[in-house]
Amino acid sequence: MAKLTNEDILNAIADMSVMNVVELVSAMEEKFGVSAAPVAAPPVVADTIDDVVVEKDEFDVMLTSFGKKKVAVIKMARSITGLGLKEAKDMVESAPVVIKEGASKVEAEDIQKQLEEAGASVELK
């Protein structure tokens, strides 16, 4: 019996019809007890939790309470948002409310400091 090379086998398969190749694959699965189904790649897992933690770069400034100095907080809210007196008053009185969305860390901390100095309770989210 002549020894078949990989090249001979590949040429023989290349000359086969698609149906014959499917039958050949099925026969090989039965004979060798394997499956030709693709194996799913294992999920990529970060080496450490530090790789997963991403520092947030945009913050929402949330007014949680206006405290005892409502007028001072309304004035500060007006200067931060550019709203009119009535709109700023309504916003402050509807606390908890977002005063500024998508602020940078420095800007958000500055707004938080200003509002807290005016007597408000503020959270950064």
Swiss-Prot record:
Pfam families: Ribosomal_L12 (PF00542), Ribosomal_L12_N (PF16320)
Listed name of the protein: Large ribosomal subunit protein bL12
Keyword Lipid biosynthesis: no
Keywords, sorted A to Z: Ribonucleoprotein, Ribosomal protein
GO molecular function annotations of the record: mRNA binding; structural constituent of ribosome
Function: Forms part of the ribosomal stalk which helps the ribosome interact with GTP-bound translation factors. Is thus essential for accurate translation.
Gene Ontology cellular component list: cytosolic large ribosomal subunit
Organism the protein comes from: Ruthia magnifica subsp. Calyptogena magnifica
